[in-house]
């Protein structure tokens, strides 16, 4: 669906995200049932999860710690006093027919994060996005509808309660986002922060991070919000961006044609790349919230809060800034290297072992990244240790080997690890950098190709590439490129 350019310039989107982050605790939020992903259906359940008579929930203290740390990392104010509430709704994936959540007294609120947005053909910019609140709640079970992707049209439904009771942190943003690109970047930055903290793996494919989008359209320059639509079922950051871009076009078309925009929940159809109406949107009054009577209030002392704050790691934005300042890296390089904490840790260990910061970055973002991505690994999984990568970089810097030789031995290092210096010595790959030795090799080469030499001196200068190639072939790429080019130039010109 495509709108004309003038129409696009008349409206702006107002976008907020509700992000559910599964907290990586070993047991569930209110019971000792396991949270392991991928187990047989209905094997990680217990009487508390199923809401059987006589059972009482007990708050997992690790969940509270993770929620507070996440709130602190999002620059939120941590509530010294908060509570749990019952959110009532009747659906088969909720065995108790209510969800234990937090309503009017969340554990954290009034925060923000800063995102960096780089769109093709546009100047990159940073933007501060408000975080309205972060609250704790339990996850629901999972429904599988036979014969359809939703309840309507299915012949029957199966329910798996393994996910029920898994701890969630729901993070609600302010409606500060304006484009699909901004929303996708916000979601990615949230995931980076959660992974750096170690409170969640943020795996969207496994449902560890799920985003719902709230979006409305209004004429530019006005403050009044349009009719809000919620979008669900986006399982990647690209899907978030595409769903928003489609929905912006759809809502603009509605306004232009006089068709009413309905307040509803819509599903993103990945196959057709469209949003589809799912149901009318409930208001908070539909859930009949009231305080959870089986759980006491949550109190976080100043001492406890500051103890948890002191345990926070350096976060992605802080690392990006430091890499630019300390290592002189570009914003792009700093962003790539800090995307995964394991990559950042590996990079810093490589530099600490003596490697040049820029050269180490180039290797990690180039050949090593290609290998890691192709094999679906993390850098930390590699047999090649940071100190060995530093040794490889230093061998090149010292002129012991060429970059070409380094690339030739890299596959072995990535697969088996070991000392680059030892491999170079064992295979006789040390770079030839003695001028007298190179001069002798060049003399032999020119003597072996008199015809080409004559043609070169007659004006066919493109043949210089032929001689360079032959010299590299003759030495197995071991000859010092810069020095050999100088000597070859001198000899060719007679």
Swiss-Prot record:
An annotated GO BP: glutaminyl-tRNAGln biosynthesis via transamidation
Known EC number: 6.3.5.-
InterPro entries membership: Asn/Gln-tRNA_amidoTrfase_suB/E (IPR017959), Asn/Gln-tRNA_Trfase_suB/E_cat (IPR006075), Asn/Gln_amidotransferase (IPR018027), Asn/Gln_tRNA_amidoTrase-B-like (IPR003789), GatB (IPR004413), GatB_C_1 (IPR042114), GatB_Yqey_C_2 (IPR023168), Gln-tRNA_amidoTrfase_suB_CS (IPR017958)
Regions crossing the membrane: none
Bridged cysteine pairs (disulfide): none
Reactions mediated catalytically: L-glutamyl-tRNA(Gln) + L-glutamine + ATP + H2O = L-glutaminyl-tRNA(Gln) + L-glutamate + ADP + phosphate + H(+); L-aspartyl-tRNA(Asn) + L-glutamine + ATP + H2O = L-asparaginyl-tRNA(Asn) + L-glutamate + ADP + phosphate + 2 H(+)
Keywords of this entry: ATP-binding, Ligase, Nucleotide-binding, Protein biosynthesis
Record bears the keyword Nucleotide-binding: yes
GO molecular function terms attached to this record: asparaginyl-tRNA synthase (glutamine-hydrolyzing) activity; ATP binding; glutaminyl-tRNA synthase (glutamine-hydrolyzing) activity
Self-association state and partner proteins as the record states: Heterotrimer of A, B and C subunits.
Function summary: Allows the formation of correctly charged Asn-tRNA(Asn) or Gln-tRNA(Gln) through the transamidation of misacylated Asp-tRNA(Asn) or Glu-tRNA(Gln) in organisms which lack either or both of asparaginyl-tRNA or glutaminyl-tRNA synthetases. The reaction takes place in the presence of glutamine and ATP through an activated phospho-Asp-tRNA(Asn) or phospho-Glu-tRNA(Gln).
HAMAP family per the UniProt record, alphabetical: GatB
Family the UniProt entry places it in: Belongs to the GatB/GatE family. GatB subfamily.
Protein name in the entry: Aspartyl/glutamyl-tRNA(Asn/Gln) amidotransferase subunit B
């Amino acid at each position: 669906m495509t709108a004309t350019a003038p129409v696009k310039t008349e409206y702006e989107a107002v976008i907020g995200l509700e992000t559910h982050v599964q907290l990586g605790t070993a047991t569930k939020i209110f019971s000792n049932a396991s949270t392991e992903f991928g187990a047989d259906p209905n094997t990680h359940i217990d009487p508390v999860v199923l809401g059987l008579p006589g059972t009482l929930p007990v708050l997992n203290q690790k969940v509270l710690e993770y929620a507070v740390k996440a709130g602190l990392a999002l620059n939120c104010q941590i509530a010294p006093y908060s509570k749990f509430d019952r959110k009532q709704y009747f659906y088969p994936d909720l065995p108790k027919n209510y969800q234990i959540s937090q309503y009017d007294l969340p554990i954290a609120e009034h925060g923000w994060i800063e995102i960096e947005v780089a769109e093709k053909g546009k100047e990159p910019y940073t933007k501060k996005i408000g975080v309205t609140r972060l609250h704790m709640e339990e996850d629901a079970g999972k429904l599988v509808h036979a014969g359809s992707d939703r309840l309507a049209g299915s012949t029957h439904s199966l329910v798996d309660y393994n996910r029920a009771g898994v701890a969630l942190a729901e993070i609600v943003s302010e409606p500060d986002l304006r484009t699909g690109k901004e929303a996708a970047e916000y979601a990615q930055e949230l995931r980076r922060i959660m992974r750096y903290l170690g409170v969640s793996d943020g795996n969207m494919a496994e449902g560890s991070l799920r985003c719902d989008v709230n979006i409305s359209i209004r004429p530019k320059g006005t403050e009044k919000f349009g009719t809000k639509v919620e979008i669900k079922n986006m399982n990647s950051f690209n899907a978030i961006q595409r769903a928003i871009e489609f929905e912006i076009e759809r809502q603009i078309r509605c306004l232009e044609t006089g068709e009413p925009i309905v307040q509803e929940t819509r599903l993103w159809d990945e196959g057709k790349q469209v949003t589809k109406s799912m149901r009318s949107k409930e208001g908070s009054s539909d859930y009949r919230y009231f305080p959870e009577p089986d759980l006491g209030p949550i109190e976080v002392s100043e001492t406890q809060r500051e103890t948890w704050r002191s345990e926070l790691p350096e976060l992605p934005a802080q690392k990006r800034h430091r890499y630019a300042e300390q290592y002189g890296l570009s914003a792009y390089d700093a962003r790539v290297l800090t995307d995964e904490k394991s990559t950042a840790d590996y990079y810093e260990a490589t530099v600490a072992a003596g490697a040049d910061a820029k050269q180490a970055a180039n290797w990690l973002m180039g050949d090593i990244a290609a290998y890691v991505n192709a094999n679906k690994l993390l850098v930390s999984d590699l047999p090649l240790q940071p100190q060995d990568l530093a040794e490889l970089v230093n061998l090149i810097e010292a002129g012991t080997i060429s970059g070409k030789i380094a690339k030739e031995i890299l596959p072995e290092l990535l697969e088996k690890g070991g000392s680059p210096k030892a491999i170079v010595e064992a295979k006789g790959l040390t770079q030839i950098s003695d001028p007298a030795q190179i001069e002798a090799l060049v003399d032999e080469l020119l003597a072996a190709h008199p015809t080409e030499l004559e043609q070169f001196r007659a004006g066919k200068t493109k043949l210089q590439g032929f001689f360079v190639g032959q010299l590299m072939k003759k030495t197995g790429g071991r000859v010092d490129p810069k020095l050999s080019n100088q000597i070859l130039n001198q000899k060719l010109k007679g």
